[in-house]
Amino acid sequence: MIRVAVIGAGNISPAHIKGYLAFPDRCRIVALCDIYPEKAERKKAEFHLDGAQIYSSHREMLQRDDIDLVSVCTPPYTHAEIAIDFMRAGKNVLVEKPMASSLEECDRMIETERETGATMGIVAQNRFTDPVMKLKQIADTGLAGRIVHAQVDSLWWRGHCYYDLWWRGSWEKEGGGCTLNHVVHNIDMLGWLMGRPKKVTAVLSNASHDNAEVEDISIAVLQ
């Protein structure tokens, strides 16, 4: 039985909770944490997680020996600290995208994983959809011949109010805009299908959101 703690009770947490609840013979959620504990309490009630303990800080959970896996569902600027703390405490971690808000933080997370022997995963669910898995098979087997060009578009509407949430829209807390927020799925998928690029040329801009520092449009060419 994998004993799970979910850190962050915001909009993405139900996806993680439902995923674990789909396998009751293999997973059990034993803890929920949010800086606003009443949000965690609501998730506990909504999903009938009767045995789950509520916390307001992830540090309160580090010494628990009955946690095997931690889902990190918090804003990007907190990912590195939380993931590193839990890996050093002997827990495996599943981190929501984006991995972190800077490359330096990503490097520290990877280094900690190697040092501790913990397992760290980053959410990239598109790899596991049937169409993408079929594309991967076609690319790997050469069924379609040599692929000379691939194009990915991620046209995702973000209304002006999207950035009214306190942590969204700043370089410090979110680390980026559309590129890290949703295009990261397409970048991951393209890299998985085609391999890592040798050269990247990109343009980022904020065209429509005066309440955000980060980009709301990005265009890149990968070679």
Where are these regions (language model features)?
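N-terminal Rossmann-like dinucleotide-binding module
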Residues: 1-48
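Structural signature of beta-strand start/N-cap positions in the alpha/beta core
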Residues: 3, 28-29, 66-69, 92, ...
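Beta-loop-alpha module in the N-terminal Rossmann-like domain of NAD(P)-dependent dehydrogenases
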Residues: 16, 49-112
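Core-facing hydrophobic residues within beta-strands of well-ordered domains
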Residues: 27-29, 51, 67, 147, ...
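Short loop/edge segments at beta-strand edges and connector loops
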Residues: 56, 95, 124, 201-204
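Rossmann-like NAD(P)(H) cofactor-binding subdomain of soluble oxidoreductases
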Residues: 78, 98, 121-127
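Predominantly a Rossmann-like dinucleotide-binding segment in NAD(P)-dependent oxidoreductases
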Residues: 119, 126-212
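Active-site beta-strand termini and strand-to-loop segments that position acidic
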Residues: 220-223
